[in-house]
Amino acid sequence: MSTRLLCWMALCLLGAELSEAEVAQSPRYKITEKSQAVAFWCDPISGHATLYWYRQILGQGPELLVQFQDESVVDDSQLPKDRFSAERLKGVDSTLKIQPAELGDSAMYLCASSL
């Protein structure tokens, strides 16, 4: 197989409808080549202290990758730490990075927040 296989990195916005508040996530869709770095960004609902990153592989339910309370990691037991990293600065926005991306990383990556 060619090493130039494309990995499909898709994500969708997961919003909460509280007086038009929503989680902002970008990019909405990401297609990349194998071995490239991928970064997703999430801006939670204002005032929400807890932030979650999920991965949903086609045909499966969502899997929690990491949970933050403000800047602190509460649970990252399912985060593949060899290539995945996540951070939340100042208890506000968060980034999820995959480097290098592999074909098996093809999934929806979802961000959510709560009080």
Curated annotation (Swiss-Prot):
Keyword Nucleus among UniProt keywords: no
Location in or out of the cell: Cell membrane
Keywords: Adaptive immunity, Cell membrane, Disulfide bond, Immunity, Immunoglobulin domain, Membrane, Receptor, Signal, T cell receptor
Claim: Signal is one of the keywords in the record: yes
Residue ranges constituting the Ig-like domain according to the UniProt record: 22-115
Primary role: V region of the variable domain of T cell receptor (TR) beta chain that participates in the antigen recognition. Alpha-beta T cell receptors are antigen specific receptors which are essential to the immune response and are present on the cell surface of T lymphocytes. Recognize peptide-major histocompatibility (MH) (pMH) complexes that are displayed by antigen presenting cells (APC), a prerequisite for efficient T cell adaptive immunity against pathogens.
Subunit relationships: Alpha-beta TR is a heterodimer composed of an alpha and beta chain; disulfide-linked. The alpha-beta TR is associated with the transmembrane signaling CD3 coreceptor proteins to form the TR-CD3 (TcR or TCR). The assembly of alpha-beta TR heterodimers with CD3 occurs in the endoplasmic reticulum where a single alpha-beta TR heterodimer associates with one CD3D-CD3E heterodimer, one CD3G-CD3E heterodimer and one CD247 homodimer forming a stable octameric structure. CD3D-CD3E and CD3G-CD3E heterodimers preferentially associate with TR alpha and TR beta chains, respectively.
Name of the protein in its database record: T cell receptor beta variable 11-1
Species annotation: Homo sapiens (Human)
